[in-house]
Amino acid sequence: MTKNLFHYLTLCVLALSLVACGSDDDGSNPTPTVTNANRNIVTANVPKEITRLEFPHLRGGDNIVIVHKTDNNTKINYSVEWDYGKKSPRWSCFPMTNGSSKGGVGRNGPFEEDPDLPSSMRFSDTNSMFTGSGYDRGHMCASYDRQYSKEANHQTFYYTNMQPQRNAFNAGSNYDGLWVQMENFVQNRAKSLKDGDTIYVCKGGTIDSESMILERIKGQLIVPKYFFMALLEKNANGYKALAFWTEHLNHTVPNAHLADYAITIDALEEKTGIDFFCNLPDDTEDKVEKSLSLISWAL
């Protein structure tokens, strides 16, 4: 009796195993596949941080990526793609949280050469290029984007984070320049974030087409004709994106209506040739980059 019961139980287990195997193979509950065809790939020649969400797709060629960190090289500050053929930054990218602009450390200059950029890849004296040019040293990652730490703030004064800007466009005579108003928007937005939420920012000026270059200081240092900001906000509800695009103006815009300069990330990519937020899954990237809700950004 015991032997027959053993054989019966064995047959039941075998039958259940066959049914289970059949269920696994029938495709009724497949594992979802996340595609990310245009993501940055880490190689021996680039830093591992290029897979972070604030990074655009790297251009390659005569370009290097410099990542600046603080707190004994443990905390991301900002990153730059530097075109050493043009001796110009293409963009600076960085995260903003509700603590980024808090702390009140002020401006911790002076402006100086980036210690992480080989001297062969830059002008021998970038300061002299700006001096007497009539252009401001325009921050991409702003000094007031980094008020939580003197070390982080000081790094924003590296010339790799600067592009020439007209004063009326940059700060203006009474902080009424368009650029500083866009910066204020990002800073105020970040301050309102909940803990754990982040705005991923990429900012720069156009350097890749002669039609988008205003002039060259001393025939060398590129002055962009247009400037941009690409913003990706991540919170408990998911992602949303916004871009600003503007001509390099020669006048102030008091109380600017920033919605007039807002476009989709897709539109910004068309204008710049830069693939922003490439490390998002493709379906998420496609959705957020073609969408623009001014109301959700309080514009």
Model-derived regions: residue spans:
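A ubiquitous, low-specificity "background" feature that marks scattered single residues
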Residues: T10-V13, D145
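C-terminal motif of bacterial Sec signal peptides marking the signal peptidase cleavage site
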Residues: S17-A20
